Design a protein with these regions (language model features):
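Short helix C-cap/helix-to-loop transition motifs enriched in small/turn-promoting residues
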Residues: 164-165
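Hydrophobic positions on the alpha1 helix immediately C-terminal to the Walker A/P-loop
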Residues: 154
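P-loop/Walker-type NTP enzyme "switch/lid" segment
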Residues: 95-122, 126, 133, 146-149, ...
């Protein structure tokens, strides 16, 4: 298997027991087999409205699924149509699907000629969805201990794999404000710097773009020096809550800078439910992973550790891009 990226989810964080004695500590919930528009039946009863204080991550919380019969009538239908329309109103863009581009950027979840590798992302997708469903989570940070572990590669291919699930809407935001890479890897031009979206200077619908029916992207190609300060600013929290409230995605993936050496991940913990850690099989050490676990401590669950590039000679190319 020389020269092949090996993707292995070798550690899955068990769910914490519910404070009310509800779900146990297993993360083996069934896949969501609802119809494509079922998630649009959610209503404001359980949603986080912009400006609403969020409970500590990992704590017991209600599902966003509507439980109020009173809200299943005309008002709920209007909300459903409105939010579905907001998703569809996002500018739709197309990817360069030439074999040269797919090979260069290793968009294996699109190419799918490498059945082993694309299948690995599908397996990761299924485990992710199962864990999120079991715990009532939606917001996942994707990071790595250090640069060069392939977190951008993993974030993009995981998002694309998720987008093939008809009943799941996914948003992928490039919040590695130190070294953004998603736009370049996909060959797309951001409409504006991510900082404009986070500070409220630019409307969400003017910034996010949509690929197909189920994947929305928040792109960036402009690094900013005060990355951690921006991520923990109140206006950032408000902007992200507004995005979730308006679009009601089923999964939100945030790519963040490497966890060690910067405080971006720590600063952003209040905005996420769980963390997916990308480790490099060629240089990530057990101490690196332990250091990341100490950052998370009891604040945010570690959803899993993905061992990437176990025997991939291209890791240096990814390291140069800070991904």
């Amino acid at each position: 298997m020389a020269g092949r990226t090996v993707l292995t989810l070798y550690a899955v964080h068990a769910a914490r027991p519910e404070a009310d004695g509800g779900r146990g500590g297993k993360s083996g919930g069934a896949m969501d087999t609802s119809r494509p528009d079922d998630h649009d039946r959610d209503t404001d009863e359980d949603a986080e409205a912009p400006g609403t204080a969020h409970p500590a991550t990992g704590a017991s919380r209600r599902s966003w699924r509507n439980r109020s019969p009173a809200l299943r009538g005309t008002g709920g239908a209007a909300l459903t149509a409105d939010r579905a329309g907001r998703w569809r109103d996002l500018q739709e863009v197309s990817l360069d699907l030439s074999q040269r581009k797919l090979r260069k950027e290793r968009l294996v979840a699109i190419d799918r000629r490498d059945a082993h590798l694309s299948g690995s992302f599908d397996m990761l997708r299924t485990r992710l969805i199962t864990a999120l469903k079991a715990n009532g989570w939606r917001r996942v940070a994707i990071t790595s201990p250090t640069a060069g572990c392939g977190k951008t590669f993993c974030a993009i291919n995981l998002a694309i794999s998720l987008s093939r699930l008809q009943a799941v809407r996914t948003v992928l935001l490039d919040l590695d404000l130190r070294a953004p890479g998603i736009a370049g890897a996909l060959g797309l031009q951001p409409t504006a710097p991510m900082s404009d979206l986070l500070t409220g200077a630019r409307d969400m619908h003017a910034h996010l773009v949509r690929i197909g029916g189920n994947l929305a992207l928040g792109l960036n190609d402009t690094p900013i020096p005060d990355s951690a300060e921006t991520l923990q600013a109140p206006q950032t929290a408000r902007a992200l809550k507004a995005m979730q409230f308006d679009l009601r995605p089923d999964v939100v993936l945030y790519e963040l800078p490497p966890a060690l050496g910067h405080d971006d991940l720590f600063a952003f913990l209040p905005q996420i439910d769980a963390v997916l850690l990308i480790a490099d099989g060629t240089h990530t050490t057990a101490e690196d992973i332990s250091a990341c676990e100490r950052i998370l401590s009891d604040r945010t669950p570690l959803l899993g550790v993905v061992l990437n590039k176990a025997d991939d000679p291209d890791s240096r190319r990814h390291a140069k891009r800070g991904s």
